[in-house]
Amino acid sequence: MSKVKKNDETLSEVLVDVNRVTKVVKGGRSFAFSAYVVVGDKAGRVGAGHGKAKEVNEARGKAKQAAKKRMMKVPLYQNRTIHHDVVGKSGAAKVILRRAKAGTGIIAGGSMRAIFDSLGVHDIVAKSIGSTNVYAMISATFDALNKLASPKSIAMRRDKKVNEISVKSAEIQVNE
């Protein structure tokens, strides 16, 4: 959605993937590390970043900085789930995110679970279709999160009142 200023103290960091890469040169092999990190404040802000370096800790630090630069705000319904179902794509990876009733929990696989934990979502159902590559999955999940909109923002875009959009939107406005 929109870029957000970041505050280090409140951010949680999750290391999603570390990969050792090898470059074959004339003198032998050169090793390096690649890291993917998700950061979030557990209150609707989340970001993901990728870092590469000769040491794991350096790669993790670079990834964290990149994730903080790419943080975005996501509208949440009652600070526990998303407002509506949404589909995100990235290459061959496709992700379906569905809102869930209170008490459902996070039903999602690996890298998606890390994003939802960092985001502060408590109830969601997520299904991945196609590629299960970590980078593609995270990218597809962020694509889906970018498509989310609150009923209030949809009403403003259409120059209408929230209760004119749909019956469910009227219920949401009353509950907020």
Curated annotation (Swiss-Prot):
<feature type="domain" description="S5 DRBM">
    <location>
        <begin position="11"/>
        <end position="74"/>
    </location>
</feature>
<dbReference type="GO" id="GO:0015935">
    <property type="term" value="C:small ribosomal subunit"/>
</dbReference>
<comment type="function">
    <text>Located at the back of the 30S subunit body where it stabilizes the conformation of the head with respect to the body.</text>
</comment>
<dbReference type="GO" id="GO:0003735">
    <property type="term" value="F:structural constituent of ribosome"/>
</dbReference>
<protein>
    <recommendedName>
        <fullName>Small ribosomal subunit protein uS5</fullName>
    </recommendedName>
</protein>
<dbReference type="GO" id="GO:0019843">
    <property type="term" value="F:rRNA binding"/>
</dbReference>
<keyword id="KW-0687">Ribonucleoprotein</keyword>
<dbReference type="Pfam" id="PF03719">
    <property type="entry name" value="Ribosomal_S5_C"/>
</dbReference>
<dbReference type="InterPro" id="IPR000851">
    <property type="entry name" value="Ribosomal_uS5"/>
</dbReference>
<dbReference type="InterPro" id="IPR005712">
    <property type="entry name" value="Ribosomal_uS5_bac-type"/>
</dbReference>
<keyword id="KW-0699">rRNA-binding</keyword>
<comment type="function">
    <text>With S4 and S12 plays an important role in translational accuracy.</text>
</comment>
<dbReference type="Pfam" id="PF00333">
    <property type="entry name" value="Ribosomal_S5"/>
</dbReference>
<comment type="similarity">
    <text>Belongs to the universal ribosomal protein uS5 family.</text>
</comment>
<dbReference type="InterPro" id="IPR018192">
    <property type="entry name" value="Ribosomal_uS5_N_CS"/>
</dbReference>
<keyword id="KW-0689">Ribosomal protein</keyword>
<dbReference type="GO" id="GO:0006412">
    <property type="term" value="P:translation"/>
</dbReference>
<dbReference type="InterPro" id="IPR020568">
    <property type="entry name" value="Ribosomal_Su5_D2-typ_SF"/>
</dbReference>
<dbReference type="InterPro" id="IPR014721">
    <property type="entry name" value="Ribsml_uS5_D2-typ_fold_subgr"/>
</dbReference>
<keyword id="KW-0694">RNA-binding</keyword>
<dbReference type="InterPro" id="IPR005324">
    <property type="entry name" value="Ribosomal_uS5_C"/>
</dbReference>
<comment type="subunit">
    <text>Part of the 30S ribosomal subunit. Contacts proteins S4 and S8.</text>
</comment>
<dbReference type="InterPro" id="IPR013810">
    <property type="entry name" value="Ribosomal_uS5_N"/>
</dbReference>
